[in-house]
Amino acid sequence: MDIYVKKAIIYQFSPDDTDLYLADKFLNITPKIEEYLRKKIERVYSDEAKTGIFEEDNPFLEMISDDLLETSVAVANRWKEEFIVSENQKTNDLVFIQFSKEGVDHFAFLRIALRETLTHLGGEVDNPIKLTQNNLPGFGTGADEALVINLQSRKYHLIEKRIKYNGTLLNYFSENLLQAQPKISPKKSIKALEKTSQKIAESFNTDDFQFQSKVKSAIFNHIEEENKLSPEKLADDLFDDNLTARLSFIDQVKEAVPEPVTFEEIDASRQLKKFENQKLSLSNGIELIVPNNVYEDAESVEFILNENGTYSILIKNIEDIQSK
């Protein structure tokens, strides 16, 4: 992912007085700071990101201009108006970034909750370990909330967390701040597809380990081969011999997943890793991890239903066995 950080500015929100501490200078983008910000941006393009395209007259989009200082002040104050009702507030850094990705200008807004950390102070003899406040999380940790906008296409990627207000959980970021309705994330979409397929299979008494394995294989194959997952195509794979089940599946998922789940600009590696193997836990305590291509090959693995209702698993053509 070719990302070049141009400018960045950082503000702080304190829950003690619910105030914003605004900066009047941009960050000095040293190599380490550039790496830190770049890694935070890269993590927004994950399977947890909601996506959408802003309308041209969207009020939030209209706040964004080439002047990062002016934009960041406007967005930070609007964010505070919406976030201030949260019942569980922490000290947060608000980071605003102008960057290019593959040569296209982008805007990013990161909310990063600061942490308490134990720090070893080398000069202290009697009490070398102390609790320090307002520490940024490490390089490998994503922002608590993040928005990235392609300024050319108006497409956005959003990582948001719900806040609690009067006992109710609110998607304040998308609904109130952005005034937008993004698609749910690929991760949640796939969970909805899995859950619905299991529900349909149960209603037709076909929800056994073989069906669950079929679901995993189908999801993996579609993502690997097409970089997307269509509910209709998945229904054809899972319920190929049952038209009623196919139609029921499509009907029940259309509200949560009305369109194919796409991985354009989204890192699909976590989903591929999740579904690349079949994991079987047997009643006798044996656990098997079988790659999909091996599991689907009858010359490698065979499941035999015995007359007494038990199963036997025949593993074939093994050239070498190692103990790990």
Model-derived features: positions:
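Long, hydrophobic alpha/beta structural blocks
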Residues: 1-274
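C-terminal structured domains
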Residues: 240-324
